[in-house]
């Protein structure tokens, strides 16, 4: 699996991203900028009819109502990362609620360590739920600046698709060339990443 991640990192390093002039966001980032970047996460046939959220003073705020069950926003695994994503309805009922909680806590000044522990406790108590069925998260934009767990550094990452895989690990999907990469392995919000053979910019 490490070889898979290394290959993805090399692919990311070789890309020229038009989005690299903006590689992080916070509550002070203009709403119109956040909306535009959030819409890059998925095809316009989805984002034109999705709920759109922006990061505000107290966490995420719904600024555009949709009708197709998708929710698009700029997620931040860490305050320094930037991950435009569009969750389907299943993700909106489960994983996305955790993401909302995380940003609400950050807005209150809670430490990252405390937030992580609260999320773990929330899953254990049933406050938070893992996805109960298969589904997809779009992350197709050029604005993906993610944490490389191997190095602790933030890298630019190519557009990709993610599929819910609660508690999945390398043993679940196999290892070696061609095997998908698992984000948050063994956790309720684990995701299986698939990078299209010719990942393309989704800038509209």
Segment roles from a protein language model:
Residues 9-18:
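Hydrophobic h-region of N-terminal signal peptides that target proteins for export
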């Amino acid at each position: 699996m490490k070889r898979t991640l290394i290959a993805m990192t090399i692919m990311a390093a070789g890309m020229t991203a038009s989005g690299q002039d903006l590689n992080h966001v916070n509550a002070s980032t203009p709403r119109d900028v956040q909306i535009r970047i959030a819409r890059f996460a998925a095809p316009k046939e989805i984002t034109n009819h999705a709920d759109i959220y922006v990061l505000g003073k107290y966490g995420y705020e719904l600024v555009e109502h949709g009708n197709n069950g998708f929710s698009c926003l700029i997620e931040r695994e860490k305050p320094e990362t930037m991950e435009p994503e569009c969750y389907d309805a299943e993700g909106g009922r489960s994983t996305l609620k955790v993401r909302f909680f995380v940003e609400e806590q950050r807005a209150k000044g809670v430490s990252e360590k405390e937030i992580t522990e609260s999320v773990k406790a929330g899953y254990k108590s049933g406050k938070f739920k893992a996805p109960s069925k298969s589904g997809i998260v779009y992350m197709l934009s050029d604005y993906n600046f993610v944490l490389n767990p191997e190095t602790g550094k933030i890298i630019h990452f190519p557009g990709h698709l993610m599929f819910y895989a609660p508690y999945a690990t390398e043993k679940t999907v196999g290892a070696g060339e061609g095997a998908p990469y698992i984000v948050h392995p063994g956790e309720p919000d684990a995701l299986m990443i698939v990078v299209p053979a010719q990942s393309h910019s989704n800038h509209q």
